[in-house]
Amino acid sequence: FLSVAGAIMMVLALNFGGFAAILTALFIIGLGFSLQQTAAQPFAIALGDPATGSHRVNLAGGVNSFGTMIGPIIYTLALFGSTKVTDAQIASLKLDSITILYSCVGGLFFIAALLFIFSKKLPAGTSESSVEKSNKATRVLIIMTLLIFGFFTPAFMSYIGVDKMNNEQSQYLSQLHDAYSANTTSVGNRQNVLFGKVFENYNTDKTLLTDNSKSALDSLIIYDASGQEKLNSSIKSIAVSFNDLNKTIKHDLEVYRLKWLFAALAVIVISLFYANARAKKSSAGWGAMRYSQLVLGMLGIFTYVGVEVTIASNLGTLLAQPEFGNMPAATIAPFISVYWGSLMIGRWAGAIPVFNPSKSMKNFLLALVPLFGFGVIIGVNTIANNNMSPLYWYVICVLVQIAGFFISQEKPATMLFVFAAFGIIAMVVGLFTTGIVSTYAFLSGGLFCSIMWPCIFALSIAGLGKYTTQGSAFLIMMILGGSIIPPIQGKLADVIGIHQSYIVAVVCFAYLAFFAWAVRGILKKQGLDFDAQLEGGH
């Protein structure tokens, strides 16, 4: 119902509100999504035997990924009446169409809510076990959250300051241009063209002009025809200096924002390790924080969600680069679809044990289902008139994933390590190549992320006993990685370039490989067989 309220508010904001109202509506819709995701995992587990609960989570995740894959196709049809759109059509999209779309979204959420309310065969979804108190852990997490907001605020406020300065700068340049035009003589037309190049080369997404630049421009207002050549040279020189100034200011500003984002990341890491260290000395009031596997797993969930989101979030910008073919926005959809479809492929394969097949049938399905899933992706996009020919050879990446399934043999620690290692290799290949090879490498990140959630979850809550419910809540909280890691990559891209910024994904996969390795020793010290005992945990 929260998402329904957000959709209703979005309709009102589009018709009667402003930008702030639209952002508020998006926040409410997003909050509804996060609550649904939080409730979905325990609900899926409660639907049957807990031993196969994580496989049902994979199945639900596969359905979710399928929706994510076909969603862009559906809303493109809804908004434009066709799956083929141009950048010009996107730019000229009217608000009326978006209003209808959000009305439909709100209606679908309302119907889904009614189905859950009135269905008599669904479990209550409540737990009879009491949640252990952890006042000290709660206090640390609250302080951590406040500090994150505190560190994010300066980064976001910098955008407001830049907008204000840009407005002042635009007014100054406009006045200067008018004054210049008023003082031109017979050569005015040519000079106006030259002066216009200053504005073409000047990117206003920066800060105020320096005093020197202002003085230089002011000196051009008064001139005569005999100074035309000198004027031409001066305008070109100022245009170049403007570009250099812009690059310097933007670089410094993005570094400033990046520092605040890294500070927020440091707060999360320090807070969790501080809580774990204090809990080991005296467990009273710390609850599940005393378990190292949980704390490392919280960072694992944080990193996993972050890398899954950041690969896709920056993919459109990456493919628009010259070394990737300068793809326009209208042609990027199939690649985004394949990425989210890759997540679907792995989760479908991870859900096979739900149906209790024989060992031979399981192995057969483990090889068949990923290929079938890839066929579904190609088929859906082909029906939508998307050109999928550049992506046919992506099947090689799917075969690598299938090999990973057979190597890991459904053992959570082994599976997590194998797929994290594959992720590292894929991201490194993507960094050191360009074109379709690099694109395939980055897209395959979806394949290798697809099975990580249940592996991390099972390994993190192993051996928690009465703290299992609390530990699960702590783990779900760490999906906030999806709101921190993508901005870090985005700001890093502004500093070192979008292609090179994918080093962030390498670091994320490297931590996940480390977690898979470290958790083995932690659980072994606690007397747990991390693979045999948790085999049902995948």
What spans do the regions from the language model cover?
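Hydrophobic core of transmembrane alpha-helices in multi-pass small-molecule transporters
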Residues: 19-36, 393-401, 437-452
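Intracellular juxtamembrane helix-capping segments at the cytosolic ends
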Residues: 35-49, 312-315, 450-465
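Glycine-rich segments within core transmembrane alpha-helices of 12-TM secondary carriers
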Residues: 52-83, 472-485
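Multi-pass alpha-helical transporter architecture, strongest
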Residues: 112-121, 382, 405-409, 506-538
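C-terminal membrane-cytosol helix-exit motif in multi-pass small-molecule transporters
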Residues: 71, 75-84, 103-130, 140-163, ...
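Extracytoplasmic gate region of multi-pass secondary transporters
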Residues: 71-72, 76-80, 147-203, 210, ...
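C-terminal ends and interior cores of transmembrane alpha-helices
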Residues: 2-16, 374-388, 404-409, 422-434
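Loop-to-transmembrane helix entry
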Residues: 250-260, 295, 324-339, 363-368, ...
